[in-house]
């Protein structure tokens, strides 16, 4: 009974009368032969859109106002909190690896690209024997740096890591701070995602509710 009601309503629908809000569009037939396609292209060319695009190109050539940079000879500056290839920090006191092998970064990684192997040393303290990050799977979300209790893993500014070999994307020693950089005192600490960039007070307008 229900199906018969639906069929009756479908057959009695009004599809002939058009509302005043609608109007018929005169669609030109699609050309099927070569001459028809040629005439259609000619009509589109002399309509004006082609000359508008050519005028824009000619105008920018005369102005010599270049809006691009010559990469890789020129590079755009990167913010201090840009999330690029990871950096593994060392301790300032002993120059040893700061990672304690807690495994929080491995647990929170949503792309499952961090692997940590640990063991107990002669003093029954946990020691990291293997730490690897598969950059081919990493989405650079920053959760590993945010959850690290020792600020051992951070994001750096190195983004040129293209390669045609997958094994090149699994690295650790390349991310560890070099000893000469530690001795020079140039290792940058992680300011945190909630911290503002340096000299930001000069550019940010303070409000009464600023904290």
From Swiss-Prot:
GO terms of molecular function: 4 iron, 4 sulfur cluster binding; iron ion binding; NADH:ubiquinone reductase (non-electrogenic) activity; quinone binding
Cofactor: [4Fe-4S] cluster
EC number: 7.1.1.-
Gene: nuoI
Subunit structure: NDH-1 is composed of 14 different subunits. Subunits NuoA, H, J, K, L, M, N constitute the membrane sector of the complex.
Principal subcellular localisation of the protein: membrane
Its biological purpose: NDH-1 shuttles electrons from NADH, via FMN and iron-sulfur (Fe-S) centers, to quinones in the respiratory chain. The immediate electron acceptor for the enzyme in this species is believed to be ubiquinone. Couples the redox reaction to proton translocation (for every two electrons transferred, four hydrogen ions are translocated across the cytoplasmic membrane), and thus conserves the redox energy in a proton gradient.
Family matches, as InterPro entries: 4Fe4S_Fe-S-bd, 4Fe4S_Fe_S_CS, NADH_quinone_OxRdtase_chainI
A Pfam family it matches: Fer4_7
Positions bound to [4Fe-4S] cluster 1: 99, 102, 105, 148
GO-annotated biological processes: aerobic respiration
Family statement drawn from the similarity comment of this UniProt entry: Belongs to the complex I 23 kDa subunit family.
Protein name per the record: NADH-quinone oxidoreductase subunit I
UniProt entry tagged with the keyword Plastid: no
């Amino acid at each position: 009974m229900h199906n018969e009601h639906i069929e009756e309503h479908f057959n009695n629908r009004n599809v002939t009368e058009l509302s005043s809000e609608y109007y018929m569009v005169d669609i030109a037939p699609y050309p099927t032969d070569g001459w028809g396609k040629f005439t259609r292209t000619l009509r589109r060319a002399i309509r004006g859109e082609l000359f508008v695009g050519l005028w824009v190109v000619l105008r920018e050539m005369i102005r010599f106002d270049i809006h691009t940079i010559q990469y890789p000879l020129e590079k755009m500056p990167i913010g201090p909190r840009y999330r690029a290839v990871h950096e593994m920090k060392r301790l300032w006191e002993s120059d040893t690896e700061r990672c304690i092998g807690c495994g929080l970064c491995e647990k929170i990684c949503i792309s499952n690209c961090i692997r940590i192997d640990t063991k107990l040393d002669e003093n029954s303290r946990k020691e990291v024997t293997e730490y690897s990050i598969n950059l081919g799977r990493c989405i650079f979300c920053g959760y590993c740096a945010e959850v690290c209790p020792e600020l051992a893993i951070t994001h750096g500014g190195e983004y040129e890591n293209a390669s045609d070999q997958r094994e090149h994307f699994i690295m650790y020693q390349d991310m560890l701070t070099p000893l000469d950089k530690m001795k020079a005192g140039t290792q940058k600490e992680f300011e945190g995602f909630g911290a503002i960039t340096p000299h930001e007070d000069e550019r940010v307008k303070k409000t009464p509710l600023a904290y």
